[in-house]
Amino acid sequence: MSPAAAAEPDGVRGDRHVSKLIFFLFVIGAILLCVGVLLSIFGFQACQYKTFPDCSMMLKIAGPACAVVGLGAVILARSRARLQQTEERLRGNNQADSDRPFLCGESRQFVQCLIFGFLFLTSGMLISVLGIWVPGCGSDWMQESLNETDTADSEPQICGFLSLQILGPLIVLVGLCFFVVAHVKKRSNLNGDQDASESEERQTQSLEPIQVTVGDAVIIFPPPPPPYFPESSASAAARSPGTDGLLPDESPPSYYSIFQSGSPTPEGQGAASERDCELIYTISGTASSSETSHTLHLLSELPPRYEEKETATTTSLSPSSEPSPP
């Protein structure tokens, strides 16, 4: 075992083995599918005429069998590729396995599209040649071509396979579409790599000081500081909506969220029922005071209590204020 392979973790090696299996299933399935289609067309289209008297029943059986096996292999490879992509998303890997370098520095999906395009293009050309150059007339086609005078009693000639002449160019067009998909996939991979390199360059440049030349003077500005709470968004997303408590590594809530939402802390959740009607007032003080504002928590029952005190004081003062009887 090479040292590079020994240094790789078991998960990466397992993913590479699965990727190779998916690739070979795709390729073998596509080859069997194309061969089966060709054998089926030749067995069911060309062998029904007397021009090919040696056509056996084996072609009519082997063609559909190869096509079905190839289609099953392609479907199995496709389902396995989707399962692997789902597993990588659960692991948190953003880059799909089909986009990684697989063969000659190219991705697996790009190589698959090239192979599919080549197979479909070759099959379409063979079918087109079979439909154009192989005559599909009866056994007496040569005799009827020589005897051009007696055409009244002769049946109309069916030379060439019209279905193959139509099906061949369609398969060629499908092969060209695979080449276009491969080109688009490569362009998207190149753009993604270029964006990643540009983001890395911007990140490295942001850590360097900025030099600004004004006339003969050169002003050097320090790099911007790192974010004060880099994990605030991640912790806020990971935290459940029902828990509003602050952890030591989380950023504090904003000023307005405290005075507007009024959500209780975990320590005071037991007394939340007693403070449902609590009102918060902010009263600005004088300039001479050390504090510029005082936050007073006034309950809804406080104004009636103040009125009771005032009435009590008035009742206590009323006997003293009345004149004494003579």
From Swiss-Prot:
One Pfam family assigned to this protein is TMEM171
Q: Where is the composition biased (Low complexity)?
A: 230-240, 288-302, 312-326
What keywords does the record list, in alphabetical order?
Membrane, Transmembrane, Transmembrane helix
Q: Which residues cross the membrane?
A: 22-42, 57-77, 114-134, 161-181
Q: Does the keyword Metal-binding apply?
A: no
Q: Where is the composition biased (Polar residues)?
A: 257-266
> Which domain of life does this protein belong to?
Eukaryota
Stretches the record annotates as Disordered: 229-326
**InterPro entries registered for this protein in UniProt:** TMEM171 (IPR029173)
Q: Which GO terms describe its cellular component?
A: membrane
Subcellular location per the Swiss-Prot or TrEMBL entry: Membrane
Report the membrane topology from the UniProt record: Multi-pass membrane protein
Protein name in UniProt: Transmembrane protein 171
**Gene symbol of the encoding locus:** TMEM171
